Design a protein with these regions (language model features):
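Internal "kinase-insert"/substrate-recognition segments embedded within catalytic cores
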Residues: 1-50
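Active-site acidic catalytic loop and adjacent metal/ATP-binding pocket
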Residues: 33-87
Length: 186
């Protein structure tokens, strides 16, 4: 039954996925045995701060991977970050204003019963405190001092030639060069 809701990118070991989901849903006190909870909290904090709603914190929890780490636990892997900074707003009331994105609740979707990962994680006061601490760290080490902006500019310069030559882009080259400091697209 999992094959309708999940895509397996490696071996077809549905039993391990089923065990993980059973623990998440029915034995949450044991979740740290099957999930790298700290890495999950970092991912959720990063997605909230960058308003990347095309992942587990949205009401449509998809577009992220889980892989088995060296400790035998599932660990999240970000994917589809091109939807960050509010470019994917499904699940938010319409119309979505810039202020809505800037003031997104730090516990966005924490009570949405259809999103088990988020509701389960945020049901723990300890995990909530860790999550807020991770948000604070990201804010202090990347946003408050503009490290993220400098890094974005460096990455933009690194891929500039390839982006200009790419015939399959979603946006024009002019939009590519201006999108660090302005909204691009709808």
């Amino acid at each position: 039954c999992y094959q309708r809701a999940y895509e397996m990118e490696s071996t077809w070991d549905w039993a391990k996925l089923g065990g993980f989901l059973d623990t998440l849903n029915n034995h949450f006190a044991e979740v740290e045995n099957v999930l790298d909870i700290d890495r999950t909290l970092w991912m959720m904090a990063f997605e909230n701060l960058t308003v990347c709603l095309d992942g587990p914190i949205n009401s449509i929890p998809h577009n992220f991977y889980l892989f088995k780490d060296n400790n035998g636990r599932f660990s999240p892997l970000l994917w589809d970050m091109n939807m960050a900074f509010g470019t994917f707003t499904n699940g938010l009331p319409t119309p979505v204003l810039i202020a809505d994105l800037q003031e997104l609740d730090i516990f966005h979707n924490s009570t949405d019963a259809s999103n088990k990962l988020t509701t389960q994680v945020f049901s723990s006061d300890r995990y909530k405190r860790m999550y807020v601490a991770h948000m604070r760290t990201i804010l202090n080490e990347q946003f408050a001092n503009n490290n993220y902006s400098a890094r974005a500019s460096a990455l933009q310069q690194l891929i500039d030639t390839d982006a200009n030559a790419d015939p399959n882009t979603f946006y024009s080259y002019t939009e590519f060069t201006s999108n660090i400091n302005s909204s691009v697209g709808s």
